[in-house]
C-alpha cells in the first residue's frame, strides 16, 4: 500500500465521522474541511501545523468580522468594497510576521466568515476542530502506512511521499 492510499483511507473515515458529528453538534461541516485543508496546505506538520492553521484562520475570522462590522457602522455606497480593500491590504502586510506568514490561511478564515454569514462563534469552533482533523488525518495515514508496510516509521510527510512514490513508479 502506498502512503497516499493509506492517507486517503484514514482521511475518508475521519472526514466522514466529522461530517456526521458536525451536523449533530450544530457545527459548520464545510468550515471544518476548510480548517483541515489549511492544515495540509500550510507546510507544517504536527502541532506546529495546527498552531499555524489556527492562528491564520482565526486572524482571518477577525478580519472578516472587521469588514462586516465596519460595513454596518458606515453604510455608504460601495463601503463594503472599500473595507474589503483596506483589510485585504492589512492581511497581506501582516504576512511579513512569522505568526501570520501563511497568508492563504488568513484569507481562508476571512472568506469563511462571509460564507458563514458572520456566525463567528460556531465558525471558530469548526475551524479549530478542522485543524485537529487535518492533524489526525496525517498521523492516522502515517500509522496505517507503517502498520501495513511494516516500516518502523514514515520518513517523509504527505507532499514529499507523493513525489517519492511517483519517482519510484517511473
Language-model features and meaning:
Residues 23-28, 72-76, 96, 100, ...:
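Transmembrane helix-loop junctions in multipass membrane proteins, especially transporters and channels
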Residues 3-4, 41-53, 72-76, 115-123:
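Membrane-helix interfacial "entry" motifs
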Residues 147-170:
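Short, highly charged, low-complexity non-transmembrane loops/tails of multi-pass membrane proteins
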Residues 27-44, 85-119:
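Pore- and pathway-forming membrane helices of multi-pass small-molecule/ion transporters and channels
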Residues 6-18, 51, 55-67, 82-91, ...:
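Hydrophobic faces of alpha-helical transmembrane segments in multi-pass integral membrane proteins
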Residues 48-58, 74, 99-109, 122-131, ...:
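A cytosolic-side transmembrane-helix exit/cap motif
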Residues 1-45, 123-124, 135-145, 149, ...:
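Alpha-helical transmembrane segments and their membrane-interface boundaries
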Residues 19-33, 68-85, 89:
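Structural signature of hydrophobic alpha-helical transmembrane segments
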